[in-house]
Amino acid sequence: MGRSLKKGPFVDDHLMKKIETLNESNDKKVVKTWSRRSTIFPEFVGHTIAVYDGRKHVPVYISEDMVGHKLGEFAPTRTYKGHAADDKKTRR
Protein backbone atom coordinates (compact mmCIF):
# COMPACT_ATOMS: atom_id res chain seq x y z
CA MET A 1 0.00 0.00 0.00
CA GLY A 2 1.51 3.31 -1.06
CA ARG A 3 1.60 6.65 0.67
CA SER A 4 -1.55 8.81 0.66
CA LEU A 5 -1.61 11.45 -2.09
CA LYS A 6 -2.86 14.14 0.29
CA LYS A 7 0.29 13.73 2.40
CA GLY A 8 2.68 14.17 -0.51
CA PRO A 9 6.15 12.66 -0.96
CA PHE A 10 8.59 12.42 1.97
CA VAL A 11 12.19 13.63 2.11
CA ASP A 12 14.30 13.99 5.25
CA ASP A 13 14.91 17.67 5.98
CA HIS A 14 18.66 17.31 6.45
CA LEU A 15 19.03 15.65 3.04
CA MET A 16 16.93 18.29 1.29
CA LYS A 17 18.97 21.09 2.89
CA LYS A 18 22.24 19.51 1.71
CA ILE A 19 20.96 19.17 -1.86
CA GLU A 20 19.62 22.75 -1.89
CA THR A 21 22.98 24.16 -0.75
CA LEU A 22 24.77 22.13 -3.45
CA ASN A 23 22.32 23.40 -6.08
CA GLU A 24 22.89 27.03 -5.00
CA SER A 25 26.67 26.68 -5.20
CA ASN A 26 26.58 24.50 -8.37
CA ASP A 27 28.75 21.97 -6.53
CA LYS A 28 28.72 18.22 -7.35
CA LYS A 29 29.99 16.62 -4.12
CA VAL A 30 28.94 13.16 -3.02
CA VAL A 31 26.31 13.42 -0.27
CA LYS A 32 26.40 10.64 2.36
CA THR A 33 23.03 9.66 3.79
CA TRP A 34 21.44 6.99 5.92
CA SER A 35 17.96 8.03 4.76
CA ARG A 36 16.87 5.16 2.51
CA ARG A 37 13.23 6.18 3.04
CA SER A 38 13.52 9.53 1.27
CA THR A 39 11.77 10.00 -2.07
CA ILE A 40 13.90 11.24 -4.97
CA PHE A 41 12.87 14.76 -6.05
CA PRO A 42 13.67 16.49 -9.36
CA GLU A 43 16.18 18.70 -7.47
CA PHE A 44 18.33 15.59 -6.87
CA VAL A 45 18.93 14.91 -10.59
CA GLY A 46 22.62 15.08 -11.52
CA HIS A 47 23.90 14.53 -7.98
CA THR A 48 25.59 11.45 -6.54
CA ILE A 49 24.16 10.32 -3.21
CA ALA A 50 25.93 7.67 -1.14
CA VAL A 51 23.13 5.55 0.37
CA TYR A 52 23.91 3.33 3.37
CA ASP A 53 23.13 -0.36 2.85
CA GLY A 54 23.89 -1.50 6.40
CA ARG A 55 27.57 -2.11 5.72
CA LYS A 56 28.89 0.67 3.49
CA HIS A 57 27.71 3.69 1.53
CA VAL A 58 26.76 2.79 -2.05
CA PRO A 59 27.16 5.70 -4.52
CA VAL A 60 23.97 6.25 -6.53
CA TYR A 61 23.97 8.71 -9.45
CA ILE A 62 20.49 10.22 -9.71
CA SER A 63 18.94 10.36 -13.19
CA GLU A 64 15.53 11.63 -14.32
CA ASP A 65 14.08 8.11 -14.45
CA MET A 66 14.63 7.71 -10.70
CA VAL A 67 12.39 10.64 -9.69
CA GLY A 68 9.51 9.41 -7.51
CA HIS A 69 11.33 6.30 -6.28
CA LYS A 70 12.96 5.83 -2.87
CA LEU A 71 16.74 6.04 -2.36
CA GLY A 72 16.80 2.59 -0.73
CA GLU A 73 15.60 0.93 -3.93
CA PHE A 74 18.98 1.56 -5.55
CA ALA A 75 21.20 0.26 -2.71
CA PRO A 76 20.42 -3.43 -2.09
CA THR A 77 20.91 -4.63 1.48
CA ARG A 78 21.24 -8.34 0.84
CA THR A 79 23.95 -10.10 -1.16
CA TYR A 80 22.83 -13.27 -2.94
CA LYS A 81 25.64 -15.80 -3.35
CA GLY A 82 23.59 -18.41 -5.23
CA HIS A 83 22.32 -21.78 -4.11
CA ALA A 84 24.68 -24.52 -2.95
CA ALA A 85 26.01 -26.84 -5.65
CA ASP A 86 24.36 -30.23 -6.14
CA ASP A 87 26.33 -32.85 -4.17
CA LYS A 88 24.87 -35.90 -5.97
CA LYS A 89 27.65 -35.91 -8.55
CA THR A 90 30.44 -35.97 -5.96
CA ARG A 91 28.95 -38.80 -3.86
CA ARG A 92 29.42 -41.52 -6.53
UniProtKB/Swiss-Prot annotation:
Lineage: superkingdom: Bacteria
Keyword Transit peptide: no
GO cellular component: cytoplasm; small ribosomal subunit
Segments forming a coiled coil: none
Gene Ontology biological process: ribosomal small subunit assembly; translation
Keywords tagged on the record: Ribonucleoprotein, Ribosomal protein, RNA-binding, rRNA-binding
Molecular function per GO: rRNA binding; structural constituent of ribosome
Pfam families in the record: Ribosomal_S19 (PF00203)
Function recorded in the entry: Protein S19 forms a complex with S13 that binds strongly to the 16S ribosomal RNA.
HAMAP family given in the database record: Ribosomal_uS19
Similarity comment text for this entry: Belongs to the universal ribosomal protein uS19 family.
Protein's name in the database: Small ribosomal subunit protein uS19
Provenance organism: Halalkalibacterium halodurans (strain ATCC BAA-125 / DSM 18197 / FERM 7344 / JCM 9153 / C-125)
